[in-house]
């Protein structure tokens, strides 16, 4: 009923009378209230955080947590995104932030499409155009890296699952474990063991 009423209202709205392509309907989606989240810096002992993404829900979480939100021109959330721009923005943000969350959406979207070839391209692009670029610019710096997906999206299911995700953490003071590759199977024998979400952040920040 609300959607139909907005169509009626917008049809006679003065702004739309002068538009070639009028807005003729409003579709509210997932209404809710802002979550009462403890500020990131307060929860983690004064750590100043920034967030980079092309996804609005990720930005919303960052805003709710009191993190600085950084928007990168050309960031699309797909395989045509500005990989280099996001990598450079992350490096620049480290100049005045203790923690930077760089979110990449392309592989997730390819999984929902069920496109294996495109997903492999997305993963390879993230590896060569983001991770390698960030590491090259920060070579010699005292930086801790954490690599992980936010959730699994098996390409045969094309939807999110609750399967544990593989995590890799790298830094000067982190001991090397037996894992030689990054995968769900290999991670089961890794030195981190199984970490719940809140424990993961604590572990990463304990290393900083």
Show where each model-derived region lies.
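Feature captures the catalytic ectodomains and active-site-proximal regions of enzymes
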Residues: 1-208
């Amino acid at each position: 009923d609300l959607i139909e009423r907005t169509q009626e209202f917008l049809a006679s709205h003065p702004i739309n009378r002068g538009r070639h392509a009028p807005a003729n309907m409003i579709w509210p989606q997932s209404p809710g209230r802002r979550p009462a989240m403890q500020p990131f810096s307060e929860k983690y002992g004064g750590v100043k955080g920034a967030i980079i993404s092309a996804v609005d829900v990720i930005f919303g979480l960052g805003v709710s947590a009191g993190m600085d939100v950084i928007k990168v021109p050309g960031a699309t959330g797909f395989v045509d995104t500005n990989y280099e721009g996001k990598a450079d923005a992350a490096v620049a943000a480290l100049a005045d932030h203790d923690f930077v969350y760089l979110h990449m959406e392309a592989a997730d979207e390819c999984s929902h499409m069920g496109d294996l070839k495109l997903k492999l391209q997305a993963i390879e692009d993230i590896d060569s155009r983001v991770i390698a670029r960030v590491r090259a610019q920060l070579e010699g710096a005292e930086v801790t890296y954490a690599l992980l997906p936010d959730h699994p999206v098996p390409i045969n299911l094309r939807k999110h699952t609750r399967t544990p995700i593989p995590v890799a953490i790298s830094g000067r003071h982190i001991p090397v474990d037996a894992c030689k590759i990054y995968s769900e199977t290999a991670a089961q024998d890794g030195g981190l063991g199984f970490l719940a979400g809140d424990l993961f952040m604590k572990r990463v920040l304990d290393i900083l």
